[in-house]
Amino acid sequence: MPQAFLLGSIHEPAGALMEPQPCPGSLAESFLEEELRLNAELSQLQFSEPVGIIYNPVEYAWEPHRNYVTRYCQGPKEVLFLGMNPGPFGMAQTGVPFGEVSMVRDWLGIVGPVLTPPQEHPKRPVLGLECPQSEVSGARFWGFFRNLCGQPEVFFHHCFVHNLCPLLFLAPSGRNLTPAELPAKQREQLLGICDAALCRQVQLLGVRLVVGVGRLAEQRARRALAGLMPEVQVEGLLHPSPRNPQANKGWEAVAKERLNELGLLPLLLK
C-alpha cells in the first residue's frame, strides 16, 4: 500500500515556528484570514504517491507573503491574475505568486524572513530571498508588468496576483508535481476546496475579471465561478513557463496582445 501523507503532519501550521496572524487593515486582513481558512481546510487532506513532500509557503514564508498582501491589496480589484500553485524557485522561496527573487526584492520591494519548511527536500532547499536560482516564469511575468507599468503601484491599482492553490508538491526524487499529476480523487478534493476559496476571495476583492495564467488555472476558475458567480468574466493568458514552446517565442509580445484584446492596457498604463 502506498503511504498516505497527511498534510497537517508533514507541515504543521507554523505553531512552533510562528503562528500566522493577519495584519490589521480591513481588506488585506480579510484576504489573509481567507488564506488561513484555506490552509486549515487543506491541512485535513491526505496525499499518497506520487507525493513525497508538501511545501506551504503561505506558512513558512508568512512574513513576506503578509507584506505582499498588506502592501498591494489595500482596496478592491477589478482584475485578478490567477496562477495555479507555487513553483520551487518562485513562491516557494519568497511567498509571493510568480515570486522570482530579484523581482520580489527589487521591484515589488517585498522583504521578510523565510523560515525552513518542517520537512525539506535536500534537492529543493528553501533559501528565501537568498535563493540564487531565478524562476523564469516569474521573471517573465513580473518583468513584463514592470516594463509596462513602470511602478508596481500602477499595476496593483486595479489588479492583484494570486494562486489558486498555495501548496507545492514534490515527488520523493524532488521533482515538482503539478496538481494535474495528483491521483484523480486527491486532486479533485484539493481543487474543490481551492475553488470554493477562490469564490470567496473574488467576492471579497470585488473582482470583475479573472485572468487564468495557463490553461489549467483558467479552466479551474471557469469551473469554480460559473455556478456561484456567473457575472465574473474568466479569460486566459498564455503561461510564461519555459516548458511552454509558445512562451519561448516571445511571451511578452503575446501577453501584450492578449491584454489589449481584453481591454486591460488602459488600466495598466495609468
From Swiss-Prot:
GO cellular component term of the entry, any: cytosol
E.C. designation(s): 3.2.2.-
Keywords: DNA damage, DNA repair, DNA-binding, Hydrolase, Nucleus
GO molecular function (one): identical protein binding
Gene3D superfamilies: Uracil-DNA glycosylase-like domain
Region entry DNA-binding, spans: 173-187
Entry binding sites for substrate: M84, F98, N163, H239
Effect of mutating G90A: Loss of damage-excising activity for U/G. Weak, but significant activity toward hoU/G, hmU/A and fU/A
Enzyme class label: hydrolase
Protein name per Swiss-Prot or TrEMBL: Single-strand selective monofunctional uracil DNA glycosylase
Family listed: Belongs to the uracil-DNA glycosylase (UDG) superfamily. SMUG1 family.
Biological-process GO terms, alphabetical: base-excision repair; depyrimidination
Organism for this UniProt entry: Homo sapiens (Human)
Disulfide bonds: none
InterPro entries hit by this protein: SMUG1, Uracil-DNA_glycosylase-like, Uracil-DNA_glycosylase-like_sf
Function of the molecule: Recognizes base lesions in the genome and initiates base excision DNA repair. Acts as a monofunctional DNA glycosylase specific for uracil (U) residues in DNA with a preference for single-stranded DNA substrates. The activity is greater toward mismatches (U/G) compared to matches (U/A). Excises uracil (U), 5-formyluracil (fU) and uracil derivatives bearing an oxidized group at C5 [5-hydroxyuracil (hoU) and 5-hydroxymethyluracil (hmU)] in ssDNA and dsDNA, but not analogous cytosine derivatives (5-hydroxycytosine and 5-formylcytosine), nor other oxidized bases.
Pfam families recorded: UDG
Keyword Phosphoprotein part of the UniProt annotation: no
